Regions:
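Interdomain "pre-motor" coupling segment immediately N-terminal to P-loop NTPase/helicase cores
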Residues: 8, 12, 16-67
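AAA+ P-loop ATPase motor domain of ring mechanoenzymes
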Residues: 42-95, 99-102, 234, 238-248
Length: 254
C-alpha cells in the first residue's frame, strides 16, 4: 500500500470519506507545486469540511419543508423591477439573521415574494442555520394543535431556538380571533430574539381586516417592523407573464 493510499484508508477509518477521496489528487498537486505539509493538510481537511457543510445544508433544507427549491440567482430582476438587486444581494449575506431582524415582503400575488423568501431560507440553511417554513394558515394550525394539547408555551419556546422561520401568504385567508391571537403570540415570542421572513399580499393598512382587529394588527406590525427590512413588490404576476388574458376565446355561432 502506498503512503497516499494508506492516508486515504486512515481517513475512511476516521469516517472522513471526502478527505479520503480528495487525498490522491491533492497529494499529486502538492508534490508538483511543492506545497508545505501544512498547506496539504489544510487542503485535505477543507475538502472534508466543505462536504460536511454541503450535506448538512441539504439536511437542513429538507427539514425546513420548503414547498419548492428557489435561489436568489434565479430571481428575474428584469421582470420584477420594483425591488433593487443590491437590496436582495445584501439580504443574501444574512446580516439580518445574525442581527435577529426581520424581512417583510408585501405585494400582489405572483410578484416574487415566496421565491425570495424560499431563496433566503435556503441560503440560511446552507450557511448552517436551521429554518422552518410554512404558510400563515399552516402556522396557525400547528400552534392551535399545540394549544389544544396544553403545549403552546413549550412550542413557542422551541421555535425561539430556530434562527429563522418563514411565514408565507399572510392575508390570503382572514383569521378568526383565536387564529389572530396565535399569530400574535408567535410574532411576540420571536421579537428581538430570532428572525422572521413574512410575506403578504396585503399592505399594512389592510392587516386590520386580515386579523379582524386593528389593535392586534397594529401591535403585530409594530413588533415585526421595529427591526426589519421591508420590501414592497409591485407589478403583474410573473406566473401569468406569457398568458393572454385580455382577449376572450372566439364564440362559435354557427
Amino acid at each position: 500500500m502506498t503512503k497516499t493510499s494508506e492516508i486515504a484508508h486512515l481517513f475512511r477509518t476516521l469516517k472522513a470519506p471526502a478527505a479520503a477521496r480528495a487525498t490522491p489528487k491533492l497529494a499529486e498537486r502538492a508534490r508538483s507545486e511543492d506545497w508545505s505539509h501544512e498547506r496539504f493538510l489544510e487542503a485535505v481537511l477543507s475538502a472534508e469540511v466543505a462536504s460536511r457543510e454541503s450535506h448538512g445544508g441539504e439536511s437542513r433544507i429538507k427539514a425546513a419543508r420548503f414547498p419548492a427549491r428557489k435561489t436568489l440567482e434565479e430571481f428575474d430582476f428584469t421582470f420584477q423591477r420594483s425591488v433593487r438587486r443590491t437590496v436582495v444581494e445584501h439580504l443574501g449575506q444574512l446580516d439580518f439573521l445574525h442581527s435577529r431582524e426581520n424581512v417583510v415582503m408585501l405585494g400582489p400575488p405572483g410578484t416574487g415574494k415566496t421565491h425570495l423568501a424560499i431563496a433566503l431560507g435556503i441560503r440560511a440553511c446552507l450557511a448552517g442555520q436551521r429554518v422552518s417554513f410554512a404558510t400563515a394558515t399552516e402556522w396557525v394550525a400547528k400552534l392551535g394543535e399545540a394549544k389544544r394539547h396544553g403545549g403552546l408555551e413549550a412550542e413557542l419556546r422551541r421555535l425561539s431556538f430556530v434562527p429563522l422561520i418563514v411565514v408565507d401568504e399572510v392575508g390570503y385567508i382572514p383569521f378568526d380571533p383565536e387564529a389572530a391571537n396565535l399569530m400574535f403570540s408567535l410574532v411576540s415570542a420571536r421579537y428581538e430574539r430570532a428572525s422572521m421572513i413574512v410575506t403578504s399580499n396585503k399592505p399594512f393598512s389592510g392587516w386590520g381586516e386580515i386579523f379582524g382587529d386593528e389593535v392586534t394588527a397594529t401591535a403585530m406590525i409594530d413588533r415585526l417592523v421595529h427591526h426589519a427590512e421591508i420590501l414592497s413588490l409591485k407589478g403583474d404576476s410573473y406566473r401569468l407573464r406569457d398568458k393572454d388574458l385580455g382577449s376572450p376565446p372566439p364564440v362559435d355561432i354557427g
